[in-house]
Amino acid sequence: MEKKDLKPAGVFKYFEEICQVPRPSKKEEKIIAYLKAFGAKHNLETKVDEAGNVLIKKPATPGKENLQTVVLQSHIDMVCEKNNDVQHDFLTDPIETEIDGEWLKAKGTTLGADNGIGVATELAILADDSIEHGPLECLFTVDEETGLTGAFALKEGFMSGDILLNLDSEDEGEIFIGCAGGIDSVAEFTYKEVEVPAGYFFFKVEVKGLKGGHSGGDIHLGRGNANKIPVSYTHLTLP
């Protein structure tokens, strides 16, 4: 298989384009400019709010004007990580992709399919005039990965749609009603420093080799957590 064989062709065409545009969280200026240029090229109404969220509107197919307006949403930032032996600047360098068996992968870095594939899907729909649809609004939010700040910054009236479909999911062909949710906790405590008694030793404790998983999609599986495991041993006294 080659990249040109990937289907749907329109989706992967735009995904490859997106991979050429650096888009770290909180540094989305280049991908915002790309989206604005896309909207202008296709003569679609495009606007950007104060946070950097982008909305591109596409009128309904003739005869579909009375359907409810649908909002398609994805986020334009990505998690930026690389292997230790890879030289890559996420602020300037494109993501290099390759086919590995049946998978499209990045060469030594994160791929950015979260949520680049959602962005590419929206762009493919906006660019394809053969798809019949009602009034359509495509929303591209910033800074999802480090706090959902783009989504939180949305103001009433920026969109007008009655239905919103978020395209940032894990499993193809499935629709979820609801979300995983999240909680932020701030814990504080006071402590008193004491001298280390004679005969005591310092130890460095590492917890590694765990299976890991997504805190939203895998939280219910009971897997080991490297933050919690060391704490569970603090009450023990070594012989």
What are these regions (language model features)?
Residues T234-P239:
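Conserved small/polar residues in nucleotide/adenosyl-binding loops
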Residues V21, S25, K105-D114, E174-I175, ...:
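Flexible, glycine/proline-enriched loop segments at strand-loop-helix junctions
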Residues E2-E102:
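Acidic/His- and Gly-rich active-site-bordering loop/insert found
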Residues E137-G213, G217-G222, A226:
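Fold-level recognition of mixed alpha/beta catalytic cores in primary-metabolism enzymes, strongest
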Residues L6-K13, K26, K30, Y34, ...:
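Conserved active-site and cofactor/substrate-binding residues in soluble primary-metabolism enzymes
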Residues K64-T146, A151-K155, G161-D162, F202:
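Active-site metal-coordination/substrate-binding segment of hydrolases
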Residues K58, S74, I99, G108, ...:
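Pocket-edge structural micro-motifs
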